[in-house]
Amino acid sequence: MQENIRNFSIIAHIDHGKSTLADRLLELTGTIDPKKMMPQFLDSMDLEREKGITIKLKAIRMNYNFEGENYILNLVDTPGHVDFSYEVSRSLEAVEGTILLVDATQGIQAQTLANLGLAKKQNLKIIPVINKIDSPIAKVEESVEELSNLLNVMPDEILRISAKDGTNVLEVLKAIIKDVPPPKHSHTPVNERENFRALIFDSEYDSFKGVIAFVRVMDGEISNGEKIELMATKTPAEVKELGYLNPGFSAQQKLVAGDIGYIATGIKEPGKVTAGDTIIKQFEIRKNPTGSKQSKFEIKPLPGYQEPKPMVFASLYPENPDDFDVLKVALSKLKLNDPALIFEQEMKEALGRGFNCGFLGTLHIEIISERLEREYGLNLVISTPSVVYKIIDNKNKEILIHSAADWPNQSTIKNMEEPWVSLEVIAPSNQMGKLMEILKSLKGNYVETNYLSPERAIIVFETPLRGIIANLYDKIKTASQGYASMNYKMLGFRSAKLVKLEILIAGQKEEAFSRIVAEDEAYFEGKRVVEKLKDVLPPQMFSVALQAAIGGKIIARETIRAYMKDVAGYLYGGDITRKNKLREKQKKGKKLMKQKGRVNVPTKAFLEVFRV
């Protein structure tokens, strides 16, 4: 039976037609009732459909009869945006082959190369496919040439399809069956039933069944009711239910090596079920062939996967302080299916209680915040995103800083480091000049330029991550009229000169506006923030000083002039001294207000400053 199983994924850049191709495969195999079929079937979230992107990893089992034999095709669908590359790495652990899909109207894009690198690392069989050949602006032969050079294959080995109208999609199905190898054991077990191992590549939470782990069975088999253990967290559990995904839960009696399916664990603590962990069976003591005792811990976990580490942080606060508990519950529920999301409670005087959250990138922030607003009815204040910094203090202690509020006194810092990335930008050759100007503004290091073809090139640039999260993607798209794409990978931490920029309003520090910036950019950033605050803060009865400071030293200042009320306006005629007395009294009152008064910063002001 294993010989007729094909486990595969589809990897592509965002909007290259991956979800549409998945739809055609579901139709051809008769997996979905035509009456229930809808565009982008596997993209179940409203956000996925609206944005035209895949966010969450999906898996589905298909059956297809080819040349008189029945084949089981397990498709693990993957996202295409750079922020969700960790989802791609999870899916590729579970398959033997992948379709590399390229849009004929755009050619190879940055995320295509990144995903291809992941597939090669896993030694997967790669099926190259050019999509959207029906488009009037398709550059089919140019795309074929690029892909042929990239993979070092003959042009006639590359399939040309239209996922939209179904042209040649049947050839893709045949290629999956013919070219993708069947599952192989990762080792030769002593006992097929006992040496069971399964890789968790995703999970979701069910209030009745507990955590449901989506798994690829690597070795052995597992049945309902058997006792299992999660190796990384040493968590014991019992199989409450197991089965296939097609696309709903289809309960079965057992899963065997090569299968992709689900296991309901009954575990009520989602943090104990982590993607990349290995599930084994519980056996206190058993014997190996030599007769000596063997512990269950001698079974090694499956290699390769590393848990994703958030590198971009932002604070989330409810506009209505009474919604704090709703936000807390909502974040907890979202984390069940999103292991890269982390959060911890924090408190700021101006905003109240909220959470400092870790994300994979700026799109990840956007997706989470929109889900919180749509699914839980929350209106949020979201701080300016920042990256994680590393400092070494005078006692040689290493500290990771996720928020400006955690930044220590500058005099106690011995060394500072920030994360750097290797950035790849793919664009038409005639637009390289404009793109180089943008990249130079990042203050990184130019590495090289490689040409995919005479018309398109790849710029490789090393730069601090903080420059990437500041709308670089939008700047590159705008400069190239939408033709450029980018991808980046982490290089680790490098030395940096950083300072904490503080904002004072009427002499009072507003911690919510504090941020970590490069020392040589502090003045420009401080000036930008106080100028923006001057535009958005309402005038008071007294003049308000807006100041940017570093370590108590003021580096930029703006002033909101006092709101002028004519206290003598109701007087007419008579002695001018009466008016002067009233105005002098007003002047003294304003001076007292300025000394004792505190400016209430409206939520709108936070939103405006965080947005720039």
Regions found by a protein language model. Name each.
Residues 31-57, 84, 153-159, 177-198, ...:
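Active-site phosphate-binding and catalytic loops of NTP-dependent enzymes
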Residues 151-283, 298-315, 319, 344-349, ...:
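Conserved catalytic-core segments of large NTP-driven translation/proteostasis enzymes
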Residues 16, 28, 81-82, 105-108, ...:
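Conserved nucleotide-binding/hydrolysis micro-motifs of P-loop NTPases
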Residues 269-281, 298-410, 416-603:
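C-terminal effector modules of nucleic-acid-centric enzymes and ribosome-associated factors
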Residues 1-108, 115, 203-206:
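P-loop NTPase switch module centered on the Walker A-proximal segment
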Residues 283-297:
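Intrinsically disordered, low-complexity proline-rich regions
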Residues 92, 97-155:
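Conserved C-terminal guanine-recognition region of P-loop GTPase G domains, centered on the G4
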Residues 15, 21, 52, 75-77, ...:
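Residue-level signature of catalytic and energy-coupling elements of molecular machines
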